[in-house]
Structures are given as C-alpha cells and as structure tokens.
Amino acid sequence: MPSIYINIFLAFILALLGMLVYRSHLMSSLLCLEGMMLSLFVLITLTALNTHFTLSFMFPIILLVFAACEAAVGLALLVMVSNTYGMDYVQNLNLLQC
C-alpha cells in the first residue's frame, strides 16, 4: 500500500476521532465531518485516476455534490439552533424535547 493511501486513511481516522471527541458542539462536528468528506474525496479521486475506468471519474463529482448538500443542511441547522437556543450544543437537536 503506497504511503499516500496510508496518509489519507490516517486523515480520515483523525477526523473520525475528532467527531467522537468533540461531539458536544455542532460546529466542531460539522468541521470533522467535512474533514472526513475531504479525505474520502481525495481517496476516491486517486482511485479513479489509478484504475483508468471511465465511469469512475464521475464518483468524485457525486461525492462533492453530496458533501455540498450536507454542508448546506448542517449550516442551516447550526443557524437555526443557535438562533433558537443561543448555543450550538448537539443535545439541543433532540426531537423529543418540547
């Protein structure tokens, strides 16, 4: 396994650990999620370039579309929660609270 794949895998694991450690604030969770998406994008792009399979060139674009949608929904949720409660704690996202 080349060292670039190991570095990308370590970046993904580091973002995942950050997601687990800093899960109390929504902004920290969104930043870690974006780090995971970035490492997946680089990994899929390198894999598409190495396989030379024509259909695999659209997978990084599809991942970027999903990452942009996820970021837009996450930021809208962050704005809504911070305007409603005045803080960005993830525990405010519980739908069972009145």
UniProtKB/Swiss-Prot annotation:
Keywords: Electron transport, Membrane, Mitochondrion, Mitochondrion inner membrane, NAD, Respiratory chain, Translocase, Transmembrane, Transmembrane helix, Transport, Ubiquinone. GO terms for molecular function: NADH dehydrogenase (ubiquinone) activity. It is a multi-pass membrane protein. One of its GO terms (biological process) is ATP synthesis coupled electron transport. It comes from the Eukaryota. One of its GO terms (cellular component) is mitochondrial inner membrane. Signal peptide: none annotated. It is found in: Mitochondrion inner membrane. Its EC number is 7.1.1.2. Core subunit of respiratory chain NADH dehydrogenase (Complex I) which is composed of 45 different subunits. Belongs to the complex I subunit 4L family. Core subunit of the mitochondrial membrane respiratory chain NADH dehydrogenase (Complex I) which catalyzes electron transfer from NADH through the respiratory chain, using ubiquinone as an electron acceptor. Part of the enzyme membrane arm which is embedded in the lipid bilayer and involved in proton translocation. This is NADH-ubiquinone oxidoreductase chain 4L. It comes from Oryctolagus cuniculus.
